[in-house]
Amino acid sequence: MNPQTSFGRKVGLLGTTAALAAALAIPAAVGAQDETAMVRVLHGVGDAPAVDVYANGDELIDALAFASITDYAVVPAGTYLIQVVPDGATIEEGPVVIEAELEFGEGTKTTVAATGTLAGEAGIIPQVVPDMPEPNAEGVQLRASHFSFDAPAVDIAPVGGEPVLTDVPFGATSDYLDLPAGPIDLEIRGAGSPDAVFTIPTLDLEAGNSYSAYAIGSFEEGTFTVIPALDE
């Protein structure tokens, strides 16, 4: 199996945060005291085109490309009907490739990821990940999400070192690891194997921050990559 070795878009900042917040804005009559949540969206389907994302019938995100992740947007806490269509399509005409009712609680931070495949038997699989790290002023926190639908369970290790995460299956997100600040080189191995199948380019981790690394795309089709993101 030969995953591509490029890092993809490190973080796709699409200028959509303002649009997302505006589309879900708290009505003026409600008032600023209402509780809010923070939400971002990741496109992890390697054979899917850019997509538009709707919530409760309003377009929130336009032309989100594969291997891109938005900034967090602050939205009113509550339940939303999330629908995803190919870029330029409408929810009335479709095709709607994801339709899910999601609840974003007061004070929460959430990443919503599209994973899986558009053409294959697995289909498109939405993933919902709570982003609630605990501050680590001296070091950093790092976790990993295995969102590559056709990859086996994996271990993650410093290059040439012992695994720090073991037997992580598809759809799983690890706990945060406490690590020292600074650059780190990591590799992905098949669970239980000493051989690397993918080397993550150097991550420069700054003290006091928390990060997620998302493995996305298709391992077999060569769209596998890892997208790092700051869990602000």
What kind of region is each of these model predictions?
Residues G31-E232:
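Intrinsically disordered, low-complexity polar regions and short flexible loop motifs
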